[in-house]
């Protein structure tokens, strides 16, 4: 897998800064963090449901 070079990451961050502006970055970061958190919860919830189904079938 190809990872971006440091100068590419800096360029991406500058583009994000220009698009959203410095005042919006905390809001964007918060929204992104909440989205990732909800995604992880949804994944773990599906795994728990699958585990419950397997236990019910095995009983």
From Swiss-Prot:
GO biological process annotations for this chain's record?
protein transport by the Tat complex
What is the predominant subcellular site recorded for this chain? membrane
Looking up InterPro entries in the UniProt record yields: TatA/B/E, TatA/E
UniProt KW keywords: Cell inner membrane, Cell membrane, Membrane, Protein transport, Translocation, Transmembrane, Transmembrane helix, Transport
Identify the domain of life.
Bacteria
Q: Where in the cell is it found?
A: Cell inner membrane
Q: Where are the transmembrane segments?
A: 3-23
The UniProt GO MF terms for this protein read: protein transmembrane transporter activity
- What is any one of the record's Gene Ontology cellular component terms? TAT protein transport complex
The similarity annotation says: Belongs to the TatA/E family.
NCBIfam families assigned: tatAE
The UniProt subunit note reads as follows: Forms a complex with TatC.
Q: What does this protein do?
A: Part of the twin-arginine translocation (Tat) system that transports large folded proteins containing a characteristic twin-arginine motif in their signal peptide across membranes. TatA could form the protein-conducting channel of the Tat system.
The protein here is known as Sec-independent protein translocase protein TatA 1
Source species: Aquifex aeolicus (strain VF5)
